[in-house]
Amino acid sequence: MEARDILKRPVITERSSELMAEKKYTFEVDTRANKTQVKDAVEEIFGVKVEKVNVLNYKGKFKRVGRYGGYTNKRRKAIVKLTADSKEIELFEM
């Protein structure tokens, strides 16, 4: 997988906005990507140094439309912590 395939989109919520003060950035990533691949992708795309990566897996929710039921897509989020001497990611600046 290429770096652009691994990182899908940034996750911008109240909690992720608070974590940005600690140089922690949240991304939705490919479900098949591991921590090492996420780290390499962030370093390649944004030109920063990554200290640590935490990964969260979410199961799909059961949804029903009339009598038909199914599941939404499963998701995977990564919280990436940058090193102290690394520059910030401009993508998240508002």
UniProtKB/Swiss-Prot annotation:
This protein's name: Large ribosomal subunit protein uL23
Family, as annotated: Belongs to the universal ribosomal protein uL23 family.
Organism: Lysinibacillus sphaericus (strain C3-41)
Pfam family, one: Ribosomal_L23
Any GO BP annotation: translation
GO MF term set: rRNA binding; structural constituent of ribosome
Region forming the signal peptide: none
Coiled coil: none
The protein's role, per its UniProt record: One of the early assembly proteins it binds 23S rRNA. One of the proteins that surrounds the polypeptide exit tunnel on the outside of the ribosome. Forms the main docking site for trigger factor binding to the ribosome.
Keyword Lyase: no
Alphabetic keyword roster: Ribonucleoprotein, Ribosomal protein, RNA-binding, rRNA-binding
One GO cellular component term noted in the UniProt record for this chain: ribonucleoprotein complex
PROSITE patterns: RIBOSOMAL_L23
Quaternary state and interactors: Part of the 50S ribosomal subunit. Contacts protein L29, and trigger factor when it is bound to the ribosome.
